[in-house]
Amino acid sequence: MSPCGRALHTSRGAMAMLARKFPRTRLPVGASALCVVVLCWLYIFPVYRLPNEKEIVQGVLAQRTAWRTNQTSASLFRRQMEDCCDPAHLFAMTKMNSPMGKSLWYDGELLYSFTIDNSTYSLFPQATPFQLPLKKCAVVGNGGILKMSGCGRQIDEANFVMRCNLPPLSSEYTRDVGSKTQLVTANPSIIRQRFENLLWSRKKFVDNMKIYNHSYIYMPAFSMKTGTEPSLRVYYTLKDVGANQTVLFANPNFLRNIGKFWKSRGIHAKRLSTGLFLVSAALGLCEEVSIYGFWPFSVNMQGDPISHHYYDNVLPFSGYHAMPEEFLQLWYLHKIGALRMQLDPCEEPSPQPTS
Protein backbone atom coordinates (compact mmCIF):
# COMPACT_ATOMS: atom_id res chain seq x y z
CA MET A 1 0.00 0.00 0.00
CA SER A 2 1.33 3.44 -0.91
CA PRO A 3 2.00 6.05 1.81
CA CYS A 4 -1.02 8.01 0.62
CA GLY A 5 -3.22 4.91 0.87
CA ARG A 6 -1.97 4.10 4.37
CA ALA A 7 -2.63 7.69 5.49
CA LEU A 8 -6.17 7.62 4.09
CA HIS A 9 -6.86 4.25 5.74
CA THR A 10 -5.53 5.55 9.08
CA SER A 11 -7.62 8.72 8.80
CA ARG A 12 -10.82 6.77 8.13
CA GLY A 13 -10.10 4.51 11.08
CA ALA A 14 -9.58 7.46 13.37
CA MET A 15 -12.85 9.04 12.22
CA ALA A 16 -14.72 5.79 12.84
CA MET A 17 -13.26 5.53 16.35
CA LEU A 18 -14.32 9.11 17.12
CA ALA A 19 -17.82 8.41 15.82
CA ARG A 20 -18.15 5.38 18.15
CA LYS A 21 -16.80 7.34 21.09
CA PHE A 22 -18.91 10.46 20.44
CA PRO A 23 -22.07 9.33 18.65
CA ARG A 24 -24.11 12.03 16.89
CA THR A 25 -27.29 13.06 18.62
CA ARG A 26 -30.21 14.80 17.02
CA LEU A 27 -31.50 18.03 18.52
CA PRO A 28 -35.00 17.78 19.94
CA VAL A 29 -37.67 19.25 17.69
CA GLY A 30 -38.25 22.07 20.17
CA ALA A 31 -34.56 22.99 20.23
CA SER A 32 -34.39 23.01 16.43
CA ALA A 33 -37.42 25.27 16.27
CA LEU A 34 -35.87 27.57 18.88
CA CYS A 35 -32.69 27.84 16.80
CA VAL A 36 -34.74 28.84 13.77
CA VAL A 37 -36.60 31.47 15.81
CA VAL A 38 -33.34 32.89 17.19
CA LEU A 39 -31.76 33.09 13.73
CA CYS A 40 -34.86 34.80 12.32
CA TRP A 41 -34.90 37.25 15.24
CA LEU A 42 -31.23 38.13 14.71
CA TYR A 43 -31.95 38.67 11.02
CA ILE A 44 -34.86 40.98 11.72
CA PHE A 45 -33.39 42.68 14.81
CA PRO A 46 -29.60 42.22 14.62
CA VAL A 47 -27.48 42.92 17.66
CA TYR A 48 -25.45 46.06 17.13
CA ARG A 49 -24.89 49.35 18.89
CA LEU A 50 -26.71 52.38 17.53
CA PRO A 51 -25.25 55.78 18.53
CA ASN A 52 -27.24 57.35 21.33
CA GLU A 53 -29.17 60.59 20.95
CA LYS A 54 -26.35 62.81 22.22
CA GLU A 55 -23.83 61.19 19.87
CA ILE A 56 -26.13 61.61 16.87
CA VAL A 57 -26.79 65.29 17.62
CA GLN A 58 -23.07 65.93 18.08
CA GLY A 59 -22.34 64.09 14.84
CA VAL A 60 -24.85 66.18 12.91
CA LEU A 61 -23.36 69.39 14.31
CA ALA A 62 -19.84 68.25 13.38
CA GLN A 63 -20.81 67.28 9.82
CA ARG A 64 -22.90 70.33 8.94
CA THR A 65 -21.78 72.19 5.86
CA ALA A 66 -23.51 74.44 3.35
CA TRP A 67 -25.95 72.15 1.52
CA ARG A 68 -25.76 71.80 -2.24
CA THR A 69 -28.00 69.72 -4.46
CA ASN A 70 -26.34 66.86 -6.32
CA GLN A 71 -28.34 65.90 -9.38
CA THR A 72 -26.26 62.77 -9.89
CA SER A 73 -27.07 61.50 -6.39
CA ALA A 74 -30.74 62.44 -6.75
CA SER A 75 -31.03 60.72 -10.14
CA LEU A 76 -29.24 57.62 -8.89
CA PHE A 77 -31.52 57.27 -5.88
CA ARG A 78 -34.60 57.94 -8.03
CA ARG A 79 -33.47 55.12 -10.31
CA GLN A 80 -33.06 52.81 -7.31
CA MET A 81 -36.61 53.66 -6.21
CA GLU A 82 -37.91 52.96 -9.70
CA ASP A 83 -36.10 49.62 -9.90
CA CYS A 84 -37.23 48.34 -6.52
CA CYS A 85 -40.63 49.88 -6.03
CA ASP A 86 -41.88 51.71 -9.17
CA PRO A 87 -43.69 54.54 -7.33
CA ALA A 88 -44.88 56.12 -10.58
CA HIS A 89 -47.15 53.11 -11.16
CA LEU A 90 -47.49 51.41 -7.76
CA PHE A 91 -47.73 54.30 -5.27
CA ALA A 92 -51.53 53.97 -5.14
CA MET A 93 -53.97 51.26 -6.09
CA THR A 94 -55.35 51.94 -9.56
CA LYS A 95 -57.45 50.12 -12.11
CA MET A 96 -54.28 49.56 -14.13
CA ASN A 97 -52.19 47.89 -11.41
CA SER A 98 -55.04 46.25 -9.48
CA PRO A 99 -57.49 44.69 -11.96
CA MET A 100 -60.67 42.99 -10.88
CA GLY A 101 -60.10 39.45 -9.66
CA LYS A 102 -56.48 40.04 -8.64
CA SER A 103 -55.43 38.66 -5.26
CA LEU A 104 -53.10 40.71 -3.07
CA TRP A 105 -51.54 40.01 0.31
CA TYR A 106 -51.79 42.50 3.15
CA ASP A 107 -48.27 43.87 3.53
CA GLY A 108 -48.49 44.07 7.33
CA GLU A 109 -49.84 40.55 7.92
CA LEU A 110 -48.60 37.16 6.81
CA LEU A 111 -51.83 35.18 6.76
CA TYR A 112 -54.38 37.39 5.04
CA SER A 113 -55.02 38.23 1.43
CA PHE A 114 -57.90 39.87 -0.39
CA THR A 115 -59.36 39.64 -3.86
CA ILE A 116 -60.34 42.78 -5.71
CA ASP A 117 -64.02 42.62 -6.54
CA ASN A 118 -66.31 45.02 -8.34
CA SER A 119 -67.08 47.05 -5.20
CA THR A 120 -63.41 47.80 -4.44
CA TYR A 121 -62.28 48.09 -8.06
CA SER A 122 -64.72 50.95 -8.60
CA LEU A 123 -62.97 52.98 -5.86
CA PHE A 124 -59.63 53.15 -7.69
CA PRO A 125 -58.56 55.84 -10.18
CA GLN A 126 -57.60 54.68 -13.64
CA ALA A 127 -53.91 55.48 -13.05
CA THR A 128 -51.73 57.36 -10.55
CA PRO A 129 -53.33 60.83 -10.69
CA PHE A 130 -50.17 62.96 -10.70
CA GLN A 131 -48.47 64.80 -13.54
CA LEU A 132 -45.03 63.21 -13.25
CA PRO A 133 -42.36 64.04 -12.49
CA LEU A 134 -43.46 66.39 -9.73
CA LYS A 135 -41.18 69.41 -9.70
CA LYS A 136 -40.44 70.64 -6.17
CA CYS A 137 -41.79 68.58 -3.26
CA ALA A 138 -41.88 69.23 0.47
CA VAL A 139 -42.45 66.31 2.84
CA VAL A 140 -43.50 67.63 6.23
CA GLY A 141 -43.06 65.45 9.29
CA ASN A 142 -44.54 66.36 12.64
CA GLY A 143 -41.40 66.72 14.75
CA GLY A 144 -41.24 69.24 17.57
CA ILE A 145 -38.25 70.85 15.87
CA LEU A 146 -40.80 72.66 13.66
CA LYS A 147 -42.17 74.65 16.59
CA MET A 148 -40.95 78.26 16.36
CA SER A 149 -39.13 77.38 13.12
CA GLY A 150 -40.85 79.93 10.90
CA CYS A 151 -40.72 77.44 8.00
CA GLY A 152 -44.33 77.79 6.90
CA ARG A 153 -43.67 80.17 4.04
CA GLN A 154 -40.82 78.03 2.69
CA ILE A 155 -42.95 74.89 2.86
CA ASP A 156 -45.82 76.55 1.00
CA GLU A 157 -43.46 77.56 -1.82
CA ALA A 158 -43.17 73.91 -2.89
CA ASN A 159 -45.23 72.70 -5.84
CA PHE A 160 -46.39 69.58 -4.00
CA VAL A 161 -46.65 69.32 -0.19
CA MET A 162 -47.01 65.96 1.54
CA ARG A 163 -47.99 65.67 5.22
CA CYS A 164 -48.23 62.81 7.72
CA ASN A 165 -51.15 61.52 9.77
CA LEU A 166 -53.73 64.33 9.52
CA PRO A 167 -51.72 66.95 11.46
CA PRO A 168 -53.33 70.15 12.77
CA LEU A 169 -52.90 73.14 10.45
CA SER A 170 -54.85 75.81 12.33
CA SER A 171 -53.67 79.42 12.33
CA GLU A 172 -51.50 78.98 15.44
CA TYR A 173 -49.26 76.58 13.48
CA THR A 174 -49.19 77.98 9.94
CA ARG A 175 -46.18 80.24 10.52
CA ASP A 176 -44.12 77.13 11.31
CA VAL A 177 -45.64 74.41 9.10
CA GLY A 178 -47.54 76.26 6.38
CA SER A 179 -51.08 75.65 5.20
CA LYS A 180 -50.67 74.11 1.76
CA THR A 181 -51.39 70.39 1.28
CA GLN A 182 -51.54 68.25 -1.84
CA LEU A 183 -51.39 64.87 -0.09
CA VAL A 184 -51.83 63.83 3.54
CA THR A 185 -51.70 60.34 5.03
CA ALA A 186 -54.36 58.97 7.36
CA ASN A 187 -53.66 55.77 9.24
CA PRO A 188 -56.75 53.70 10.12
CA SER A 189 -55.67 53.87 13.78
CA ILE A 190 -56.26 57.64 13.68
CA ILE A 191 -59.79 57.07 12.37
CA ARG A 192 -60.40 54.71 15.30
CA GLN A 193 -58.87 56.92 17.98
CA ARG A 194 -60.04 60.37 16.92
CA PHE A 195 -63.26 59.66 15.07
CA GLU A 196 -64.62 56.41 16.58
CA ASN A 197 -64.28 54.57 13.27
CA LEU A 198 -66.95 56.89 11.81
CA LEU A 199 -69.59 54.62 13.34
CA TRP A 200 -71.50 57.25 15.34
CA SER A 201 -70.92 60.67 13.84
CA ARG A 202 -69.21 61.78 10.66
CA LYS A 203 -69.53 65.55 11.06
CA LYS A 204 -66.42 65.98 13.21
CA PHE A 205 -64.35 64.09 10.65
CA VAL A 206 -65.74 66.01 7.67
CA ASP A 207 -65.12 69.32 9.45
CA ASN A 208 -61.53 68.30 10.26
CA MET A 209 -60.85 67.43 6.62
CA LYS A 210 -61.74 70.90 5.33
CA ILE A 211 -58.35 72.27 6.38
CA TYR A 212 -56.70 70.05 3.73
CA ASN A 213 -58.62 71.66 0.85
CA HIS A 214 -58.39 69.80 -2.50
CA SER A 215 -55.87 67.20 -1.32
CA TYR A 216 -55.43 63.47 -1.65
CA ILE A 217 -56.03 61.43 1.52
CA TYR A 218 -53.56 58.54 1.29
CA MET A 219 -54.61 55.50 3.34
CA PRO A 220 -53.01 52.06 3.85
CA ALA A 221 -56.36 50.28 3.61
CA PHE A 222 -54.77 46.96 2.73
CA SER A 223 -51.81 46.85 5.10
CA MET A 224 -53.68 45.28 8.03
CA LYS A 225 -57.01 43.53 7.84
CA THR A 226 -58.38 45.66 10.68
CA GLY A 227 -57.65 48.80 8.68
CA THR A 228 -59.75 47.98 5.63
CA GLU A 229 -63.20 48.85 6.98
CA PRO A 230 -62.21 52.22 8.54
CA SER A 231 -60.47 53.19 5.30
CA LEU A 232 -63.51 52.35 3.21
CA ARG A 233 -65.70 54.36 5.59
CA VAL A 234 -63.45 57.37 5.01
CA TYR A 235 -63.89 57.00 1.26
CA TYR A 236 -67.68 56.76 1.43
CA THR A 237 -68.00 59.52 4.04
CA LEU A 238 -66.13 62.04 1.91
CA LYS A 239 -67.97 60.94 -1.22
CA ASP A 240 -71.40 61.18 0.44
CA VAL A 241 -70.88 64.81 1.52
CA GLY A 242 -69.23 65.87 -1.73
CA ALA A 243 -65.98 66.80 0.01
CA ASN A 244 -63.06 68.34 -1.87
CA GLN A 245 -60.67 65.59 -0.81
CA THR A 246 -59.96 62.42 -2.82
CA VAL A 247 -59.03 59.14 -1.15
CA LEU A 248 -56.13 57.13 -2.55
CA PHE A 249 -55.38 53.65 -1.20
CA ALA A 250 -51.73 52.69 -0.77
CA ASN A 251 -50.70 49.69 -2.83
CA PRO A 252 -49.55 46.96 -0.40
CA ASN A 253 -46.95 45.73 -2.90
CA PHE A 254 -45.41 49.21 -2.97
CA LEU A 255 -45.30 49.42 0.84
CA ARG A 256 -43.83 45.92 1.11
CA ASN A 257 -41.10 46.68 -1.44
CA ILE A 258 -40.21 49.95 0.28
CA GLY A 259 -39.84 48.04 3.55
CA LYS A 260 -37.51 45.50 1.90
CA PHE A 261 -35.49 48.28 0.29
CA TRP A 262 -34.74 50.00 3.60
CA LYS A 263 -34.21 46.75 5.46
CA SER A 264 -31.44 45.92 3.00
CA ARG A 265 -29.87 49.25 3.97
CA GLY A 266 -29.85 48.62 7.70
CA ILE A 267 -33.22 49.76 9.04
CA HIS A 268 -34.57 46.98 11.23
CA ALA A 269 -38.00 47.67 12.68
CA LYS A 270 -41.40 46.07 12.84
CA ARG A 271 -42.55 48.70 10.37
CA LEU A 272 -41.22 51.84 8.74
CA SER A 273 -42.64 55.15 9.85
CA THR A 274 -45.21 56.90 7.67
CA GLY A 275 -42.69 59.68 7.16
CA LEU A 276 -40.07 57.40 5.63
CA PHE A 277 -42.68 55.83 3.32
CA LEU A 278 -43.58 59.33 2.10
CA VAL A 279 -39.98 60.48 1.67
CA SER A 280 -39.24 57.29 -0.29
CA ALA A 281 -42.19 57.94 -2.57
CA ALA A 282 -41.17 61.58 -3.03
CA LEU A 283 -37.64 60.57 -4.01
CA GLY A 284 -39.15 58.47 -6.79
CA LEU A 285 -41.82 60.95 -7.90
CA CYS A 286 -40.17 64.38 -7.52
CA GLU A 287 -37.26 66.19 -9.10
CA GLU A 288 -36.41 68.06 -5.88
CA VAL A 289 -37.21 66.93 -2.33
CA SER A 290 -37.00 68.96 0.87
CA ILE A 291 -38.04 67.47 4.20
CA TYR A 292 -39.11 69.23 7.39
CA GLY A 293 -39.81 68.02 10.92
CA PHE A 294 -37.76 64.83 10.63
CA TRP A 295 -35.94 65.03 13.96
CA PRO A 296 -36.89 62.23 16.39
CA PHE A 297 -34.91 63.53 19.35
CA SER A 298 -35.81 65.27 22.60
CA VAL A 299 -33.46 68.24 22.11
CA ASN A 300 -32.92 70.58 19.19
CA MET A 301 -29.64 71.48 17.51
CA GLN A 302 -28.81 73.88 20.34
CA GLY A 303 -29.45 71.23 22.99
CA ASP A 304 -32.71 72.76 24.19
CA PRO A 305 -35.59 70.40 25.08
CA ILE A 306 -38.35 70.13 22.47
CA SER A 307 -41.69 68.32 22.32
CA HIS A 308 -42.09 65.13 20.31
CA HIS A 309 -44.56 66.74 17.88
CA TYR A 310 -44.97 70.40 17.03
CA TYR A 311 -48.53 70.21 18.40
CA ASP A 312 -48.16 67.84 21.42
CA ASN A 313 -45.69 65.72 23.36
CA VAL A 314 -47.36 62.32 23.02
CA LEU A 315 -44.66 59.69 22.57
CA PRO A 316 -45.06 56.73 20.17
CA PHE A 317 -45.09 53.09 21.25
CA SER A 318 -41.50 52.04 21.83
CA GLY A 319 -39.99 49.36 19.62
CA TYR A 320 -42.44 49.69 16.73
CA HIS A 321 -40.43 52.10 14.56
CA ALA A 322 -36.67 52.62 14.37
CA MET A 323 -36.66 56.40 14.23
CA PRO A 324 -32.94 57.05 14.93
CA GLU A 325 -31.98 54.54 12.22
CA GLU A 326 -34.36 56.22 9.80
CA PHE A 327 -32.94 59.63 10.63
CA LEU A 328 -29.37 58.48 9.96
CA GLN A 329 -30.38 57.18 6.53
CA LEU A 330 -32.12 60.46 5.67
CA TRP A 331 -29.18 62.47 7.01
CA TYR A 332 -26.88 60.52 4.69
CA LEU A 333 -29.12 61.38 1.71
CA HIS A 334 -28.94 65.02 2.80
CA LYS A 335 -25.14 64.92 2.97
CA ILE A 336 -24.80 63.51 -0.55
CA GLY A 337 -27.25 66.07 -1.95
CA ALA A 338 -30.08 63.68 -2.88
CA LEU A 339 -32.55 65.59 -0.68
CA ARG A 340 -32.48 68.62 1.59
CA MET A 341 -33.22 68.21 5.30
CA GLN A 342 -34.23 71.43 7.07
CA LEU A 343 -33.02 71.38 10.68
CA ASP A 344 -32.44 75.05 11.45
CA PRO A 345 -35.15 77.70 11.74
CA CYS A 346 -36.06 79.10 8.33
CA GLU A 347 -35.21 82.70 7.55
CA GLU A 348 -38.22 84.95 7.57
CA PRO A 349 -38.23 88.41 5.96
CA SER A 350 -37.74 91.24 8.42
CA PRO A 351 -40.88 93.26 9.15
CA GLN A 352 -41.18 96.47 7.16
CA PRO A 353 -40.64 99.61 9.26
CA THR A 354 -43.78 101.61 9.85
CA SER A 355 -43.85 105.22 8.71
Curated annotation (Swiss-Prot):
The compartments listed are: Golgi apparatus membrane
One GO biological process term: cellular response to heat
Give an example GO cellular component term for this record: Golgi membrane
Q: Which residues cross the membrane?
A: 29-47
Keywords attached to this Swiss-Prot or TrEMBL record, sorted alphabetically, are: Disulfide bond, Glycoprotein, Glycosyltransferase, Golgi apparatus, Lipid biosynthesis, Lipid metabolism, Membrane, Signal-anchor, Sphingolipid metabolism, Transferase, Transmembrane, Transmembrane helix
Know the name of this protein? Alpha-N-acetylneuraminide alpha-2,8-sialyltransferase
Q: Which Pfam families match?
A: Glyco_transf_29
Query: Per the UniProt record, which EC number(s) apply here?
Result: 2.4.3.8
Domain of life per record = Eukaryota
Q: Where is the active site?
A: 321 (proton donor/acceptor)
Q: Which GO terms describe its molecular function?
A: alpha-N-acetylneuraminate alpha-2,8-sialyltransferase activity
> Which stretches of this protein does UniProt put in the Lumenal compartment?
48-355
Q: What does this protein do?
A: Catalyzes the addition of sialic acid in alpha 2,8-linkage to the sialic acid moiety of the ganglioside GM3 to form ganglioside GD3; gangliosides are a subfamily of complex glycosphingolipds that contain one or more residues of sialic acid. Can catalyze the addition of a second alpha-2,8- sialic acid to GD3 to form GT3. Can use GM1b, GD1a and GT1b as acceptor substrates to synthesize GD1c, GT1a and GQ1b respectively.
Which positions in this protein are listed as binding CMP-N-acetyl-beta-neuraminate?
142, 165, 273-275, 295, 309
Please list the residue ranges that the record places on the Cytoplasmic side of the membrane.
Answer: 1-28
The record's PANTHER family line, in alphabetical order, gives: ALPHA-2,8-SIALYLTRANSFERASE (PTHR11987), ALPHA-N-ACETYLNEURAMINIDE ALPHA-2,8-SIALYLTRANSFERASE (PTHR11987:SF3)
Protein's gene: St8sia1
Q: How does it sit in the membrane?
A: Single-pass type II membrane protein
Record InterPro entries: Glyco_trans_29, Glycosyltr_29_Sialyltrsf, GT29-like_sf, Sialyl_trans
Glycosylated residues: list them: 70, 118, 213, 244
Q: Which family does it belong to?
A: Belongs to the glycosyltransferase 29 family.
Pathway as given in its UniProt record: Protein modification; protein glycosylation; Lipid metabolism; sphingolipid metabolism
* Cysteine pairings via disulfide bonds: 137-286, 151-346
EC class of the enzyme, as a word: transferase
